[in-house]
C-alpha cells in the first residue's frame, strides 16, 4: 500500500467519481478526507469511509469560499496532518446557450470549477514543499478539449484547469511535487442514467469502446498518479474517455 501514512484530500467525494477516488486512495493506505457541500453529505462520506475500512473523515466545504477552505485545511492539519495528496474533483454545471447564459451561470461555474484550484492548491503547497513530496490531481473533462454546445462556461473552466496544472507543474517540480489532470469522458453516474434512452444511444455512437465509463476506472488512474509509480509524471492530462476524443 504505497500511500500508507499519507493524508489525501478529495473534494466532491459524496458520490460518483469523487467517492470512487476516495475509496481507491484509502485502499492504497491513505488517510482520506472527503468533502461535501453539506453537513449531511459530509456525514455520509464518513460513514462510507468507515464501512470500507478507510481511515479519515468527511468534512463540509464550500470550495468557492476562502474562509471555508482555510477552516477545512486547518482542521485537517490539526486532526490528521498536512495533506500531501490533493484531488480537486468538486464541480458544478450550469448549462445554457451563450446567448441566454446569465452572469451567475458563468461566474458560479468558473468560481467552483477553476478558482477553487487556486484556493486549495495554494493552501496545501507549503506543507507539500516542507515534506518535499506532493501530488495535486485535477479532475477535468473531455469537454475541456472538444467543447460541447450549451457548456461554454464548463468547457472554459476545464480547459483552464489543464493550463493551470501545466504551469504549476513547472513551478513546483523541483520540490518533488507533481501536478496532473485526469479528463473523464461520459461516466455511468446518476446524471447520465437519467438521460432519455435515445440520447444515451446517440452518445454511445460517439464512443469507440461503445459504453459509458465507470467511476472506478477514473479512480484507478487517480490512484496511479498519487502513487510512487507516477513520480516521473507531471504536467500531464490523462484522457479516460473510451476514445471519444483522441489527442
Show which residues each predicted segment covers.
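Residue(s) in the substrate-gating loop at a strand-loop-helix junction
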Residues: 141
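Active-site helix of classical SDR
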Residues: 121, 157, 165
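Conserved glycine-rich cofactor-binding loop
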Residues: 7, 14-15
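Conserved glycine-rich Rossmann-like NAD(P)H-binding loop of the short-chain dehydrogenase/reductase
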Residues: 28-44
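Alpha-helical segment proximal to the catalytic Tyr-Lys
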Residues: 126, 170-174, 231
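Substrate-binding pocket helix/loop in short-chain dehydrogenase/reductase
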Residues: 97-98, 102-110, 192, 203
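Short, small/polar-rich loop/turn modules that mediate ligand/substrate recognition or access, typified
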Residues: 173, 178, 233-235, 241
Amino acid at each position: 500500500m504505497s500511500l500508507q501514512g499519507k493524508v489525501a484530500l478529495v473534494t466532491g467525494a459524496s458520490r460518483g467519481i469523487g467517492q470512487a477516488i476516495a475509496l481507491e486512495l484509502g485502499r492504497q493506505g491513505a488517510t482520506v478526507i472527503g468533502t461535501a457541500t453539506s453537513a449531511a453529505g459530509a456525514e455520509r462520506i464518513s460513514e462510507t469511509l468507515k464501512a470500507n475500512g478507510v481511515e479519515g473523515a468527511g468534512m463540509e466545504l464550500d470550495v468557492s469560499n476562502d474562509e471555508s477552505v482555510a477552516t477545512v485545511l486547518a482542521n485537517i492539519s490539526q486532526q490528521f496532518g498536512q495533506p500531501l495528496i490533493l484531488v480537486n474533483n468538486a464541480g458544478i454545471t450550469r448549462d445554457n446557450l451563450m446567448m441566454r447564459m446569465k452572469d451567475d451561470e458563468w461566474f458560479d461555474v468558473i468560481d467552483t470549477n477553476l478558482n477553487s484550484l487556486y484556493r486549495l492548491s495554494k493552501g496545501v503547497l507549503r506543507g507539500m514543499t516542507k515534506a518535499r513530496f506532493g501530488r495535486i490531481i485535477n479532475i477535468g473533462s473531455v469537454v475541456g478539449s472538444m467543447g460541447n454546445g450549451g457548456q461554454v462556461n464548463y468547457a472554459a473552466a476545464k480547459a483552464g484547469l489543464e493550463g493551470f496544472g501545466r504551469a504549476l507543474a513547472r513551478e513546483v517540480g523541483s520540490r518533488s511535487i507533481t501536478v496532473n489532470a485526469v479528463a473523464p469522458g461520459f461516466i455511468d453516474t446518476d446524471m447520465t442514467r437519467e438521460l432519455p434512452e435515445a440520447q444515451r444511444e446517440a452518445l454511445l455512437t460517439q464512443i469507440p469502446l461503445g459504453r459509458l465509463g465507470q467511476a472506478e476506472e477514473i479512480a484507478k488512474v487517480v490512484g496511479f498518479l498519487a502513487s510512487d509509480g507516477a513520480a516521473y509524471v507531471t504536467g500531464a492530462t490523462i484522457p479516460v474517455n473510451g476514445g471519444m476524443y483522441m489527442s
